[in-house]
């Protein structure tokens, strides 16, 4: 694809459809998640090649804790494998990727918390590309924890602005999303980046995430480039 001028700086990704993909192909649910992880690694490279500088991916929601125990355990294994492998951490360093895990980290198992702390520390000075991986995350939770911080800091009500809240969200310091891509055919927000995504453009793809390819990203970018963003005006 030729480089476009109107490339979104920040893309939010809903990599939906792993379980449905597995079912339709006669695979176990866990295989769908494994294929989804592999596809995300490609997606990251495609975005970087096109000039995107921030990716926020919905890895595991607050509500996903209600899924079968085996599935939850496997997903935690995938996160730990992806964030904890020496090869991947070296790649993050080599390519200047700043990794930030957003969500209720205290709910994660200790070994995963340790891996997260390590990769965040190792990549904290990288500035070429930002990867936000949402694990045990919910948009309502994010706003709630920001409000709690404001209360704890004793900020008077009359001094609270939108910026006061935005600066205390888990994505503070990064630009708000420009484009939200959701694979898998669903057309809803699912309690993700509710505040940050207020003025983002939405793009829905009917393909399940493991089948989402480079051309599908380009289709989303072409559609984004055609739109006139109004930011509520």
Where are the predicted features?
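Flexible, compositionally biased loop and terminal segments
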Residues: 1-233
